[in-house]
Amino acid sequence: MHNWIIIGGIQGMTLATFLRKQKGVAPEEMAIIDPHEEPLSEWRRCTEAISMPFLRSPFVHHLDVDPFSLNRHAKASLFGEGASFFGKFKRPSLLLFHEHCEHLVREQEIRRSWIQGRVESIKRLENGWKIHLENGSLVMGANVVLAIGAGEQLHWPEWAQQLQTDSPGSIFHVFDKELPKFDASQAPFTIIGGGITAVLLTLKLHKQFPGQVTLLKRHPFRVHDFDSDPGWLGPKYQQAFHNTRSYVRRREMIVAARRKGSITRELNAALRKQLRQFPRLVADGHVHKANRQKGITSLFDEDGSLIHQTGTAILATGFQPQLPGSSWLAPIIEEHRLPCAACGYPVVTHTLQWGPGLYVMGPLAELEVGPIARNISGAREAASRILQAQ
């Protein structure tokens, strides 16, 4: 039996690093369950799909325990410190961040703990938990940490679902595993969205296919350096959040704090620079219906008026807000009467304990950690709290 079973990707990797370095947990004492063959492969796939050059978070947010670990790694790397960070907040390049992650994977022997598989069910034992995987394997451990994200819950608006049903291959989600190569898709391209993912993808495709790309957004660009106020990283906002006993109110605070669909200043500047030469690169419109005839996809608003026509539509519409892993979480919530708020998310202790030997991170922890829960900063906070309970 393992001491720790961690279910999840980048959040779980953060906890694994903290357990190895701060608690001396050996690789064979941990089991990291993930559907993918390699650590962080899904994170890499998504960030590479949009050619993200720099992370949105500052240099102290990464998977290692020491906040300055990434900075030291940059000084010792081939990239050099000057080319590795952007702006006054020293946001790390994606290449540096990936290299640092791989360094930690090797250094902490994470692959020795890696188990590729999908969770089918979880059962409580007298002294721990038993995880059933879809491939028939069983994994048992004293403590289980649910660090699952929302990465497999892609948001497809109703009109997009209908278009995909009626005309397969005419529309994709940018984070779809089946996303084809762009040069094999029909131009022109229309990106649906208005946030950082949409703008990064627009700039990427515009470079490949100049004059054949349009970003279709339904709201003005919301320009912010970060996806929530930095005050949420400390007591400035966290104190009031934790003093709030109502979980309905906490959910309202989380929704209000998130700068959903926002972009950074340098992306806004880069897009506006291209707009001077290509004024049709960005258009406004809220799609309610779509159809495809004779190889052309037509997009319509709620009044049925034509907004735009395209060859291939690509959604950059984010993820669905419901509870991650609900299909296999629902039975254990009911069986063990695990506390949940009205929104369906876990109600946990300060150390993120949901039940005996059962802990949460990421989206599942946001009613306790706050709006940063889904970010790398939230992963570090969650890992620190879980270790406090040991």
Q: Model-predicted segments: where are they?
A:
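Glycine-rich phosphate-binding loop and adjoining beta1-alpha1-beta2 segment
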Residues: 40-56, 232-233
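A conserved beta-strand/loop capping segment in the N-terminal third of enzymes
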Residues: 63-95
